Amino acid sequence: MIDRLEKIQEKYLRISEELNSAKDPSSLKSLYKERSRLTPLYLKVEEYLKIYKDKKDAEELIPSEKDEEMHSMLKEEIRRASKKLEELEKELEILLLTPDPNSGKNILVEIRAGTGGEEAGLFVADLFRMYSKFADKQKIKSEIIDSAPTGIGGLKEIIFALEDERAYDLFKFEGGTHRVQRIPSTESGGRIHTSAVTVAVLPEADEEEIEINENDLRIDVYRSSGAGGQHVNTTDSAVRITHIPTGVVVACQDEKSQHKNKAKALRILSARILEKQTEDKKQASDAIKKQMIGSGDRSERVRTYNFPQGRCTDHRIGFTSHNLSAIMEGDLEELIGALTEEDRARKISETQVH
């Protein structure tokens, strides 16, 4: 283990040296980001290695130490050092976890109505409200990118951006199918209906990650339509972009300006292409899949919201809250904390420090 920790020291110091000589803005940005990520680990490694050295020095002195009091002091020093090293090993286990490559990124969140007709559309709007309230509490900037209203207060689909370095880590477990059980306001017999919506969390691509060639795009423009399909604009402001190499298609009609819709569509396109690339890599690596709490796939059932019982259950970790009303108001800290801890515990069990 000492060799591994010394290599971390060397890497950190090498990056610091490279920062002093780097002049290219993109290299500087990348180096600063990497050093910032490594700093907490480097400081903990420094502390561990110092205590480890002190313990070794004390162990070497004990055989030749004749003074009984000094012998006793050295043994006590070794005992304290051993205890502290055990504590530091646990902290290092967490810090040594392979960082998620998407950590620190802005994200796009896409919520779509699934089975359940109008009820599903209403729940899309409810989930968007829940996420918006949680983002507000966390002081995370949000922006609607595109939406498709149903006309009765619901949404067929909504895509919104969350811009903050904590956004991905806080929302990464939200991807999948969210099921809702409740009595619709139009239901006179009091029967509980079950409907579902799907959530996708798409990390936004950095410029260096995705390079889109204009020649690979087919761009179509058309008139935007509102609820019920009626045209809401007299000009061709809506934009549909097809990325020919991957077959990824996105459309945006939220803005009145074709230029703004194109910019938003390109933003979604970059995130979708990155998602496709990530999924391809995941399928090629069973090890990555095993490390995750759920796959984040749209088809995976992740959570049930039971309104008659006031209960919310996350099926991946068996977490149940009987305070559904608070959760729908954006109180997601306990739930997200439980998911984060479970994910961390699983990863630590596979990456022991020895």
Curated annotation (Swiss-Prot):
Disulfide-linked positions: none
Post-translational modification N5-methylglutamine, affected residues: Q230
Region (Disordered): 282-301
Pfam families: PCRF, RF-1
Principal subcellular localization: cytoplasm
GO cellular component, one term: cytoplasm
Keywords associated with the record: Cytoplasm, Methylation, Protein biosynthesis
Keyword Cytoplasm: yes
Similarity field: Belongs to the prokaryotic/mitochondrial release factor family.
PANTHER family to which the protein is assigned, alphabetical: LD18447P
The protein's role, per its UniProt record: Peptide chain release factor 1 directs the termination of translation in response to the peptide chain termination codons UAG and UAA.
Protein name: Peptide chain release factor 1
Organism: Leptospira borgpetersenii serovar Hardjo-bovis (strain JB197)
Gene assigned in the entry: prfA
